[in-house]
Amino acid sequence: MEESAIRKAAAQMMELHGNGAELAAASKADAMLNQGNIDGFYAWNRISAAINDLDRKAV
């Protein structure tokens, strides 16, 4: 997944989930791992990290 797609997904998650966006992304990463979807796991971990980064920049 390209960085621009990661950032877009992070912004969408923040819009949908507000302060719970990072937790929601982490939950999706866990679900991907439980399903054996390693690529999905890494993608959602990157989205979670991007949410954290955007949160820090917003402060």
Where do the protein language model's features map onto the residues?
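Short intrinsically disordered terminal tails
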Residues: 1, 56-59
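Amphipathic, hydrophobic secondary-structure cores in small proteins
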Residues: 14-50, 54
